[in-house]
Each structure stands twice: as C-alpha cells, then as structure tokens.
Amino acid sequence: MKKTKIVCTIGPKTESEEMLSKMLDAGMNVMRLNFSHGDYAEHGQRIQNLRNVMSKTGKKAAILLDTKGPEIRTIKLEGGNDVSLKAGQTFTFTTDKSVVGNNEIVAVTYEGFTSDLSVGNTVLVDDGLIGMEVTAIEGNKVICKVLNNGDLGENKGVNLPGVSIALPALAEKDKQDLIFGCEQGVDFVAASFIRKRSDVVEIREHLKAHGGENIQIISKIENQEGLNNFDEILEASDGIMVARGDLGVEIPVEEVIFAQKMMIEKCIRARKVVITATQMLDSMIKNPRPTRAEAGDVANAILDGTDAVMLSGESAKGKYPLEAVSIMATICERTDRVMNSRLDYNNDSRKLRITEAVCRGAVETAEKLKAPLIVVATQGGKSARAVRKYFPDATILALTTNEVTARQLVLSKGVVSQLVKEINSTDDFYRLGKDVALQSGLAQKGDVVVMVSGALVPSGTTNTASVHVL
C-alpha cells in the first residue's frame, strides 16, 4: 500500500470529472490549483468537478490553493517580441512602468527595485536563464552587465539572489484569491515566497477575517531569506513546501538537495507536513517514461521523510498526466516498503510530552507485535501526526468527528482518515476502530492492532495506548 501522498496540479488536460476520477484511481491524494494561471470560473469548476467525483465514488482527496505570491516580473517589450541579449553588453532595468522595452532596457513591476539592490548584486531573469551583474544605480534605473547570451521576454520572473526585498507578503491578487479559497472551502493554502514569520501571520489573519480559520498554511520556501528564517517560519506554519524551482535559482543548485534534507528533517521533528515539489518527473511533460535520475529523485525525497511528492506541469499540461501519476505512485509504493521506523532508541534522551510519549510507545509496541494497524482517535489531527513522526510499518487509521481534520489528514504520510459521527467514550472508540479496521480491509480477523486515544474533548491529551485482537 502506498503511504507517501501525491499532490497533482490540475490544468486543462486533467480538469474533467472523468480524468479526475482516473487520477484518484492512479494515486492522486491532493488537487493543487495554481493561481498563477487560470481564473475563478476555471478553478471553481475544477473544485466542483472533484467534489462531484468524490460524492459519486466515495474517494477522498484534499484541495490545495497555491498563491501567485509576491514576485518581480518584466513588463512590456516593443511588439511583444523577445529580444536577444549578448554577454558583455549593458542592459538597464527601470521602475518607470510606462517604458516599452527593447534590447537595452525593460521596466519591472517592483517599485523598490532600485532601493533594494546594490552594485555587485546579481540579477537573474527567466528562471535564471539570463544572469546580470549590477554595475550602477541611477535614479529609477539599475544598470547591469549581461553575463551570458539569452532571449528576454515580457512577463518573465526576475530573481535577486541573496537580496532581502521589501515586497508585501500578500499582493492584491493574492488577497482576492484567498477570499475565493475561503468561499470555496479549500483545505490548504500553499503560500508562495514566504520570507519570514510575519508573512505567515499576515496570511493567517487574512484567512481568519474571511472565514478561513480552519485552512492550513503550507509555506513555500523559495529563496535564501526563507531558508535563513526557516525555524520561525516553520513554527508559524502548518506545513512546508520545498519549492525547488525558484529555490534552485536563488541559491546555488548544488545546495538545493541539502536544503531539502534540512527542511524535511525539521518538519518531521515538529510534526508538520512537508511536500517536496518541482521537476520531480519533469521529462514526462513530453515523454511517456521518466529518466532514471527523476525516479531516483522521487525515491530520495521519500527516504528523506517527505509526506508528499508533487507533480506540476506533468499533470497540468503534459502529454502523459495519468502515466505520470501511476509511475509516481509505483515509485512511492516501492520506496515506502523499505522505509524503516524512526524510533532512534539510542539517540533520543529528550523528555517527551505525554502525547508524544504515548504515540512513540504505540509505534514501538506495533513494531514489536508486527501489528498492521495503529488506530488513533484525533480531533485536530495532532495525535495522528505524532504517530506518523516515527514512520511505523503499520498503517495509521485516524478516526475523527471533524470533517476538516479528515480531509487535511489526507496529506499526511501513512495516514488513512475516517470520518465518524461521534465517539462518546473510550469503549465506543475501541468498538468503532475495530469495525472500521475490518470494513476497510486495513486489518483482518485475528490481527493485532494498537489503539491510541485520550481525553474525548476537542484537543484533549492523548494518554492511552492499548493492544487489541480483532
């Protein structure tokens, strides 16, 4: 059984009910809507289509809204045509948005471009394909030396590696997009270009103000500033997306894998979900099979401990969206089989909180008894994530009376969530847990299961782990 979850970006190729149903069958767990593209009518229809499929089939999936985020882009060029730049030439950026650009100058969307940069800084355009060095700053112009040949286009992203920029966490478009997400009842927001804790706080306040207090925030780490402030960002977020595309432009490419490993490890310790994203099966946008390196990249992220791996263009616009999900699911399943539990008996001398100690003990018991299932009663999902932290061989069955929690746990590795009407007592939980375990096929008659519960009130302390035979 696949434990690692798959996030699929949905686009024109995959938005129909028929395709969404096939994607769910192939292994999709979360639908990602990329708000850098598309309008509300398109995204609203995709949400409706997925909900129709879930209601008809009983399949489960969560919905993630990915914001465009604060970014710097080039503006107009003469005739809308790309211009060729040559290594060694002088090129100018201006904050005067009325300027129509050519092969010597282009306007950018960010007013603070001149004040944030210094002579000697690097400017990268179009995902780093064109590099420039700042040689002078004059009024509203930044004058650069072009470092390599390349074609510059309109509306291309501009990165300033190592530069702290004063862009707001929420652009006006993002604010409207988040209100749309609140109205639609999405489960997660992936917040782009998060640089510091206050960015997350601002987004959370905006969500709360529009009825989205239950939406979980997944912060995307895409630049050096986000890495520098990672601990405070993690503390304020519900999860992290390792967004390797922009990150690989902002920091040296050889550093990306180490940043990935650091972020995943810290998320595991903090019991926060983590998604590894970008270019995972990139060649499958055009080809029916991935490269060996891509397959290894997916497996490596799973071995690092990621909750989920993500498809972007592969599932949104590629030629082989279904094949991409199927192959990714196969890699997940194969790699999940060799994942060892992480109890770290010898290295862990920390004093644990009650919930953590009970959940750790439950995993230890399940490992020793070779139990196929750990059943957890959870209101907000914390107990299920506390068990997941130790990567048990057993599947985690999370019973909850909270519909939002049931959907959000879809993103957590190794967790199968089940919505139940009520849990009135510990005995009630034991009875329900055994019934669901058998009905779902996650365990068979005669199997040993470990059951974890606690105070049956919202956010109660988990304080009991017990062993049962079905």
Swiss-Prot record:
SUPFAM superfamilies: Phosphoenolpyruvate/pyruvate domain (SSF51621), PK beta-barrel domain-like (SSF50800), PK C-terminal domain-like (SSF52935). PANTHER family: PYRUVATE KINASE. It is an enzyme of class 2 (transferase). It catalyses: pyruvate + ATP = phosphoenolpyruvate + ADP + H(+). Gene3D superfamilies: Phosphoenolpyruvate-binding domains, PK beta-barrel domain-like, Pyruvate kinase, C-terminal domain. Pfam families: PK, PK_C. Belongs to the pyruvate kinase family. Substrate binds at residues 32, 245-246, 278. K(+) binds at residues 34, 36, 66-67. This is Pyruvate kinase I. ATP binds at residues 34-37, 73, 156. Homotetramer. Keywords: ATP-binding, Glycolysis, Kinase, Magnesium, Metal-binding, Nucleotide-binding, Potassium, Pyruvate, Transferase. GO terms for molecular function: ATP binding; kinase activity; magnesium ion binding; potassium ion binding; pyruvate kinase activity. InterPro entries: Pyr_Knase (IPR001697), Pyrv/PenolPyrv_kinase-like_dom (IPR015813), Pyrv_kinase-like_dom_sf (IPR040442), Pyrv_Knase-like_insert_dom_sf (IPR011037), Pyrv_Knase_AS (IPR018209), Pyrv_Knase_brl (IPR015793), Pyrv_Knase_C (IPR015795), Pyrv_Knase_C_sf (IPR036918). The record marks 220 as: Transition state stabilizer. Its EC number is 2.7.1.40. Mg(2+) binds at residues 222, 246. Its cofactor is Mg(2+); K(+). It comes from Salmonella typhi. Pathway: Carbohydrate degradation; glycolysis; pyruvate from D-glyceraldehyde 3-phosphate: step 5/5.
